[in-house]
Amino acid sequence: MQAARAIYLVLDMQNDLVHAEGPNGKSPLGEQVRKRELLVKTARAIKKAREAGVLVGFVRVGFTAGYPECPPNSPVFSAAPANGLFKLGAWGTEIHPDLEQREGDIQVTKHRVSPFYATGLEAALRARNVTKIYCSGVSTQAVVQATVRDGHDRDYEMIVLEDLSCAHSDQEHENSMGSLARFCKVEKSDTVTFTNP
């Protein structure tokens, strides 16, 4: 039987959301990304996870031409077509260039907030016998919350790297982390020890 594995999922760290030249670069979210030094710290965490033999995966939100997968009634996504956001194949849906991707990393494209909804993520994790998920990204109140709750209910051990996640304000981030603490372990990137189960 294949040994149990862990993965570090990097959530929605794509140019449309975290690049200084992207549409959110001058928004409150962009300010939080810079203030919390998310890019440099996430790059360090990816390196640390790889050195520990932990798998790495990248999650992005994206829609094909014409946005057929985009939910028209969603307050989160319904404005994407009019604003040209999250177009697959475009610069905006590329993972930020400061975050090293390698061949063999798990790549997940999602059309909703949760990376588990209507994607191949769970099949990829089960095939690799992943039982523990480390995660971080933007935003805390959206993809991080959804990943933790959905992962918890699928019986994964969930760990959030708190300092590598952010929301549109400190208060939103803190409120989200407070509600997540029941469903996961909360760690800091400089003290976390990445381990396989």
Listing of model-derived features with the role each one plays in the protein:
Residues 14-15:
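Positively charged, low-complexity intrinsically disordered leader regions
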Residues 4, 22-49, 53-58:
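A short alpha/beta connector and helix-capping loop motif
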Residues 9, 18-19:
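Short glycine-rich His-centered loop
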Residues 19-25, 70-75:
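Short, flexible, mixed-charge acidic loops at enzyme active sites
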Residues 1-7, 44-52, 63, 69, ...:
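Active-site-adjacent betaalpha module
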